[in-house]
Amino acid sequence: MAKRIIYNENARRALEKGIDILAEAVAVTLGPKGRNVVLEKKFGAPQIINDGVTIAKEIELEDHIENTGVALIRQAASKTNDAAGDGTTTATVLAHAMVKAGLRNVAAGANAITLKKGIDKASDFLVGKIQENAKPIADSNAIAQVGTISAGNDEEVGKMIADAMDKVGKEGVISLEEGKSMETELEVTEGMRFDKGYISPYFATDTERMEAVLDEPYILLTDKKIGLVQDLVPVLEQIARTGKPLLIIAEDIEKEALATLVVNRLRGVLNVAAVKAPGFGDRRKAMIEDMAVLTNGQLITEDQGLKLENAKLEMLGTARRVTINKDTTTIVAEGNEVAVSTRCEQIKKQMDETDSTYDKEKLQERLAKLAGGVAVVKVGAATETEMKDKKLRLEDAINATKAAVEEGIVPGGGTTLAHMAPALEEWAASNLSGEELIGANIVASALTAPLMRIAENAGVNGAVVAENVKSKSFNEGYNAANGEYVDMLSAGIVDPAKVTRSGLQNAASIAGMVLTTECIVADMPEKKEAAAAGGGMGGDFDY
């Protein structure tokens, strides 16, 4: 296909146009008075959402060059989402502000490479500042505050997540599922999460989120490599008759067997997913045995004279629900309390008997995984559309609270970044010079963008609010919900430091890439073929 090549200013301006479009669509959702965005779906009802990264994923423009700009800034949002799970809108607004200010300087003749160096140095300085000012999470009240803000000021959600963390611990697993009633409920059940995802992405049942969700599956547990599909055929036939899904947890699955499973999954013959067992050697076997206890199944191992081809349905484990993504697998089980607590006692005895610190640590990990359980939040809503929106908000809130536990909290509402602008300007003036200094000042000018946008979405002049906030002490900021200047930490308006840090780093990275772009190679727009003339009723024909 023919390509068009665009250079210099034209290339950057085309990128900027795409970035403007995406940033505006995402920015309307920012803050307590941010609006929703409606996404039209080819199939099914439209989706009403308030989540930056989901909106960014939906935007595709007709012009290929502008679409490249959209894809670049979408990357800032999705990388922030991967790292911290929240703060995607802030990252987009920051990246947009940095690109706008930077392009003005490049157009005026500044050297883009030196500007980028200045931007990177400013970003490193700010990351240090954010970590310096982060306060560790003290109690479940602080967790509830983080959850409330991330869920779009829904206090009930914040409280529920704090309760869930109290019950399963700060490292515990919180899982979301669609409830049957109008109310959102919390339930704690047995279960575990381990750090292995699906072997092939073709096992994903939800392609938008790239997740495989199996309801009431059978679970086949084995410590051997599955090389031939013939070994699996007897079990697969028994399961196909029941119509239930199957999860296979094995040491590995080789290409031929994997290909057969994938083909059966895609053709709809059998809903199946396969995961490699976590750990190595004896430790791997012990972890699979833990899973067997949890799911009330049996480990199919040749040490006990059991072979895959002779496996019966009653040897397989069962679970209420299994969720698998590319990195983790979460099993939600139920009804095996006695077996699980006996197994936990066994592990505790092993811990008492071992002298090795390393073994103790690994046993402690296994115990935590098995005893911790899983908190299941059943999302309740009146309609399908509300359910999807609520699920996205809850997911953001869970991710934000986990990030807050990891790296602490900072004042929210765009306050932290705005307060750091004067400090950055001062540091840059004494440590940088020339175009590097201009690069750092580009970042400084962009730091107030999230706060200004939050204020504008609340119907107030953003520039005035930003200047007022800068003149106050570090913890004081603008509460857009009621239009007052308050101490953000006391008012419970807080952001996880990790979210603020990731958003800033990804925004600076993308801005640097856009500014140093000198040429774009993109597909030529396809020429639309002229429609054929309609038959009958022609103009100049004699009949």
Swiss-Prot record:
This is Chaperonin GroEL 2. It comes from Synechococcus sp. (strain CC9311). Together with its co-chaperonin GroES, plays an essential role in assisting protein folding. The GroEL-GroES system forms a nano-cage that allows encapsulation of the non-native substrate proteins and provides a physical environment optimized to promote and accelerate protein folding. NCBIfam families: GroEL, PRK00013.1, PRK12849.1, PRK12850.1, PRK12851.1. PROSITE patterns: CHAPERONINS_CPN60 (PS00296). HAMAP family: CH60. The keyword Isomerase applies. It comes from the Bacteria. It is found in: Cytoplasm. Pfam families: Cpn60_TCP1 (PF00118). Disulfide bonds: none annotated. Forms a cylinder of 14 subunits composed of two heptameric rings stacked back-to-back. Interacts with the co-chaperonin GroES. GO terms for biological process: protein refolding. InterPro entries: Chaperonin_Cpn60_CS, Cpn60/GroEL, Cpn60/GroEL/TCP-1, GroEL-like_apical_dom_sf, GROEL-like_equatorial_sf, TCP-1-like_intermed_sf. It catalyses: ATP + H2O + a folded polypeptide = ADP + phosphate + an unfolded polypeptide. Belongs to the chaperonin (HSP60) family. GO terms for molecular function: ATP binding; ATP-dependent protein folding chaperone; isomerase activity; unfolded protein binding. The gene is groEL2. GO terms for cellular component: cytoplasm.
